[in-house]
Amino acid sequence: MTLKKLNLHLVSDSSGETVISVAKSALKHFRSVETIEYVWSFVKGEEQIDKILEEINRKSDEHNFVICTITDDELRKYLKDNCIKLKIPYRAILSHIIREISSYLEIEKDEKLDLHTEINNEYFQRIEAINYTINHDDGQNIQDIDKADIILVGVSRTSKSPTSTYLAYRGYKVANIPFVSGVPFYVDLAKLKNKLTIGVTIDVSRLIEIRKNRLTSINNEDNNIYANPEKVEKEIKEAEELFKQNNWPIIDVTQKSIEEVSATIIQYFNKMLSID
């Protein structure tokens, strides 16, 4: 398979995270394309755009493509007009969506929003959420569990940790707590206000399979308790009884992706906020 080379110029007036994410999603559809990404972040003026265009011009004999998420209309038009002059393919991502929403609702977009401050705040909030979630994995640091947005409870190997991490990247502070059969549940979650607690469960046979694979991966196949069918079934049953006693929403993660599980959790979270 012959690879086609593409210089992808990603231009943003902020960190560039959005345009990078969109570009990566699009490029997944082209296995025959070898891409070199040039990320131009925090572009605020025409002089910066001129420098970008100079750099692209140096590679005029190659394939170049510009994608931008510049929100300022005049600056975006300046980039677009110059790309047209230089015959460089150009696509703005956000402007079309903003225009369609504006047209559909028959309202003008807000011109004087401090978008950079908002984006920076979102970034730091996400970092804070990630740090919190990492430090509250598997029942750690429960002394400040009241600072969590979401709490996941479930038996071992029910995807609590990866789900927590995924949610953290979405900006949610997540704590996850293991349920262990025969051990009294040691956290009083009933007294917490405005916190979503989710009970995570899974099909018995699927959990046995996952646990056996885990034991094999760590060369501990002699462990006849961790994946014992009777023990696993008892463990799940006790966990589900705890969930029901506390009226926690229960999510069955059997054959579900982390993204699917997380989307369901976010729906529960938004519903909780709307009720409050």
Swiss-Prot record:
Gene3D superfamilies xref list: P-loop containing nucleotide triphosphate hydrolases (3.40.50.300)
EC id: 2.7.11.32, 2.7.4.27
Reactions mediated catalytically: N(tele)-phospho-L-histidyl/L-threonyl-[pyruvate, phosphate dikinase] + ADP = N(tele)-phospho-L-histidyl/O-phospho-L-threonyl-[pyruvate, phosphate dikinase] + AMP + H(+); N(tele)-phospho-L-histidyl/O-phospho-L-threonyl-[pyruvate, phosphate dikinase] + phosphate + H(+) = N(tele)-phospho-L-histidyl/L-threonyl-[pyruvate, phosphate dikinase] + diphosphate
Record-level Gene Ontology MF annotations: ADP binding; ATP binding; phosphotransferase activity, phosphate group as acceptor; protein serine/threonine kinase activity
Enzyme class: transferase
Protein role: Bifunctional serine/threonine kinase and phosphorylase involved in the regulation of the pyruvate, phosphate dikinase (PPDK) by catalyzing its phosphorylation/dephosphorylation.
Family of the protein in this entry: Belongs to the pyruvate, phosphate/water dikinase regulatory protein family. PDRP subfamily.
Protein's UniProt name: Putative pyruvate, phosphate dikinase regulatory protein
Organism: Wolbachia sp. subsp. Drosophila simulans (strain wRi)
